[in-house]
Swiss-Prot record:
Residues 1-19 form the signal peptide. This is Non-structural protein 3a. It comes from the Viruses. Keywords: Signal.
């Protein structure tokens, strides 16, 4: 029995060492269900490209994020906004 417990603990420690932690933003902590999922998705959209210039794709729609190369006045006047429901997100 002791050998089984030691093996189980060792396996759990190894699994935890190689697992990716789940980050939950503070403002999403008190939510549950679909509201929680929507909060996580919105946070993903808000933070995509914050540290690197990248694109986010969902259901075949690609949304580019280039926060360093865009002057905000030009960006907002020359591009049409894309509502999240057009990009495949449902709340």
């Amino acid at each position: 029995m002791v050998s089984f417990n030691a093996t189980a603990i060792l396996l759990l420690l190894l699994a935890n060492a190689f697992s990716k932690p789940l980050y939950v933003p503070e403002h999403c902590g008190g939510m549950s269900g679909t509201l929680f999922q929507a909060c996580i998705r919105q946070t993903m959209v808000d933070t995509t490209g914050m540290y690197t210039n990248s694109a986010m794709s969902h259901d075949g729609v690609t949304i580019p994020f280039d926060r360093d190369g865009i002057v905000h006045e030009d960006h907002y006047t020359e591009t049409n906004p894309t509502p999240l429901f057009d990009a495949g997100f449902s709340v």
